[in-house]
A protein has these predicted regions:
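Histidine-/acidic- and/or cysteine-rich, low-complexity loops and terminal segments associated
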Residues: 1-57, 80, 112-121, 140-162, ...
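Juxtamembrane transmembrane-helix termini in multi-pass membrane transport proteins
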Residues: 3, 7-11, 50-94
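Residue-level signature of transmembrane alpha-helical entry/exit and packing/kink sites
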Residues: 17-21, 47-51, 85, 89, ...
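Transmembrane alpha-helical segments that form the membrane-embedded catalytic/substrate-channel core
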Residues: 64, 130-143, 209-213
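Membrane-interfacial entry segments at the cytosolic side of transmembrane helices
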Residues: 117-125, 217-226
Length: 258
């Protein structure tokens, strides 16, 4: 009876840690919604520090809901001080996605320049973006990374061997690296749809969560890959499918170049 009670307490504590991560994601979404009013005006040109801050909050909003169960499970492997150590794990995870903002900035700047100066080339660039995502979504490397994100038990066993004051940060960063490997091509679609495009954020966040949490997540990944390949062809006939590259609905950084 005592064992059952302890198990129930552990489960409840794990659920509480998941809720903490979800609350963080909700706060990030609230920031994005409020900030959207500023970025949509076209008066603001993103500098790198501002872009990295915005990108980090975006990634927290989009990626943490799918990662909350893993963070909570990690907290349950820690005997004491679970909340601060889970916070360090989550921070390490977000740090990886924050670092991904550096190439994202270069790509977003390039997309803005293409849309403003070479609209015809923008359609070809959009087709390339959709094609890259489609091919990667169907690749063995995507499957491998997605498997690690969906079934992290092996990773958690590895993290148990980590030592030192930074072990929890390292564990989160390691898990974040696998998730980056799983989802980087989806984030590439922001080049086509526009950074800070709220509908793109919601759609891509839904895809990420479905891939990682639904029983048929790998099937979702393949379906998205096939749809992306179809968009790579369709964008030549319907350029507005990629508004950020074809100038049909410029948002965020692209507007700064208009």
């Amino acid at each position: 009876m005592v064992g059952v009670t302890r198990t129930a307490i552990t489960v409840r504590r794990g659920a509480g840690h998941a809720e903490l991560v979800l609350l963080t994601a909700a706060a990030a979404w609230a920031w994005v919604v409020l900030r959207r009013g500023d970025t949509g005006s076209g008066a603001m040109a993103w500098e790198l520090p501002a872009f990295l801050g915005m990108w980090t909050v975006m990634m927290a909003a989009m990626m943490l809901p799918a990662t909350a169960p893993v963070a909570a499970l990690y907290a349950r492997t820690v005997p004491v001080h679970r909340t601060p150590r889970m916070t360090a794990f989550t921070a390490g995870y977000v740090l990886v996605w924050s670092a991904a903002g550096l190439p994202a900035y270069a790509l977003a700047t390039g997309a803005a320049h293409i849309a403003a100066t070479h609209p015809a080339a923008g359609t070809a660039a959009a087709a390339a973006v959709f094609a890259v995502n489609g091919v990667y979504q169907l690749s063995p490397l995507k499957d491998r990374c997605l498997t690690k994100c969906r079934s992290p038990i092996g990773l958690l066993l590895r993290y148990a061997s980590y030592r030192g004051p930074s072990r929890h940060l390292r564990a989160g960063a390691h898990h974040g690296a696998f998730c980056l490997g799983c989802c980087w091509s989806l984030m590439l679609l922001f080049m086509a749809f526009g950074v800070m495009n709220p509908w793109a954020m919601v759609g891509l966040a839904a895809v990420v969560t479905a891939e990682k949490r639904l029983p048929r997540g790998p099937l979702v990944a393949r379906a998205v890959g096939l749809a992306s390949l179809a968009l790579a062809l369709a964008v030549f006939w319907a350029p507005l499918l990629a508004p950020n590259l074809t100038g049909g609905g410029m948002t965020g950084m692209t507007r700064a170049y208009a």
